[in-house]
Amino acid sequence: MTNTRFALLLGLVLAFVIPATPAHAAPKDLFNGRDLAGWVVMHGGEWLVQDGAIIGRNGTNWTTNPEKSGSWLRTEKEYSDFVLELEFAINAKGNAGIFLRSGLEKNPAFTGHEMQILDDHGNEPKKYTTGALYDVVAATKNMSKPANEWNKVRVTCKGKRIQINLNGEDIVDYQTDRLTRGYLGLQNHDAHAVVKFRHIRIAEL
């Protein structure tokens, strides 16, 4: 057998024996649907699990302590590059958010970013409406559903780039100058808000 034929045969064998390296880790659940295992309560409020969803209520009003930015749950570990998918629902006149790569010092909405969640279906998109990176960049469209209906969001963070897809529409594509590694968080902004989260999954890139 010539060297060329042997090399070709060896290549074919290795192709079947050695699995390809995946582009990123397989998605995993951040919420088991039963309890708050894997999550840490920050700054009070009431967090519970009901009917397969995390519910946040009786939050700490941020105006009494701006450094805390309301009550929130955070992940036990920090994340850098990832695709985060979840569903959320907010009550009438409610205010909540999703913290992305936030630190524990000062306000997590400004160490990392906060994806805003509001009861604002049909409103003009601004830097503080649903899907926006709060006080930084508005969504291109307000894709939020009416109060108490479930919304599906996908957030992709890779390096300095943050992309958000809400209810099937790409609405944010932004280059950040803030932390590129930190905690993920679920925020309940104040005592009036009742926010729900479910089907929380992450794939690290």
Tell what function each PLM region has.
Residues A23-L205:
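Carbohydrate-interacting regions of secretory-pathway proteins
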Residues A7-P19:
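Bacterial N-terminal signal peptides
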